[in-house]
Amino acid sequence: MKPKYLVSLEQVANIDAKERAELKRVTDLFAFRSNDYYLSLINWEDLKDPIRRLIIPNPGELEPWGHLDPSSEHRYTRAPGLQHKYRETALMLVSDACGGLCRYCFRKRLFIKDAREVNKDVSKGLDYIR
C-alpha cells in the first residue's frame, strides 16, 4: 500500500541523491512531510517553483532568522496544549501532524523533535475552558 504521507526525501523520486544529501542537515532538524498531490503540483524543472519552495526543505532554513515562536504564543498558553489569546476563542494543540509541513510555518517549532507543546491529554485544557 502506498503511504498517505511522505515523511522522508528518500520517498520523493524527483529529488536526486546529491540534493537529498545536501538537505539532510535541514531534515535532521526540521521535519519533512508532504503528499503525492502537493508533489504533483511542482514543476521540477524550476528550482524556484513556488510549490517546491513551499514544500521541499531549503538550506536557508538553517540560517539564523528569528524566533521559533514569532507570534509569542507562549504568552497565551493557559494549560498544556491550550492557547487563549482572544476573549471568545481558545485553541487546543492536540496533534503534531499536518498535511504538509510548509517550510515557512510559524508553528514550525511544534514539529521539531522533542517539542512538548502538543498535548494528547486534553483534560487540563478542557478544565480551563469550563
Protein language model features and the residues they cover:
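Short pre-active-site segment immediately N-terminal to redox-active cysteine/selenocysteine motifs
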Residues: 97-101
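Conserved Radical SAM active-site core
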Residues: 56, 68-93, 103-130
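Flexible, acidic/Gly-rich N-terminal and inter-domain linker regions that tether
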Residues: 1-85
